[in-house]
Amino acid sequence: MSVATNPNHAGADREVGTQALNRELQDKGFLVTSSEDIINWARTGSLHWMTFGLACCAVEMMHTSMPRYDAERFGIAPRASPRQSDVMIVAGTLTNKMAPALRKVYDQMPEPRYVISMGSCANGGGYYHYSYSVVRGCDRIVPVDIYVPGCPPTAEALLYGILQLQRKIRRTGTIAR
């Protein structure tokens, strides 16, 4: 009995055929793509974020919505309800007493959902890291996609984190997460 050690090329012919079809139709105004790519493209331009402001980082988070930075030009708009939002921005010190509320709000968000951890306190406890009542990073309660460092981070840093999240969504998939 012999074992085949050749690499698996299943689907390679289909990929080559799709690329050839794309080249042929490109000049005619058509585009061949998958529905998942279209969904990822649309989702990156229409993220709805929900604030979970717990401390001074929340003030900088508010600045991103003001006219100077205008986060809506990047396709991200604030929402008041977790059921209408795709992104949760955790900004500030997360205490042990507040952790169950954070998890409950996260569970109410529809899939796919993303979390941005903003500031040193949300990232790892910050100044209050050794306090008995502080969670040493919100990633112990909810899965975090993007970390924004700083104490408090600037509005520009948060905007950069939002752009990184959009890039991550485009690069990975939103359907199977």
From Swiss-Prot:
InterPro entries, per database record: NADH_UbQ_OxRdtase-like_20kDa, NADH_UQ_OxRdtase_20Kd_su
Cofactor(s) listed in the protein's UniProt record: [4Fe-4S] cluster
Membership in a protein family: Belongs to the complex I 20 kDa subunit family.
Gene: nuoB
Keywords from the UniProt entry: 4Fe-4S, Cell inner membrane, Cell membrane, Iron, Iron-sulfur, Membrane, Metal-binding, NAD, Quinone, Translocase, Transport, Ubiquinone
Protein name from the UniProt record: NADH-quinone oxidoreductase subunit B
GO biological process, one term: aerobic respiration
EC code(s) of this entry: 7.1.1.-
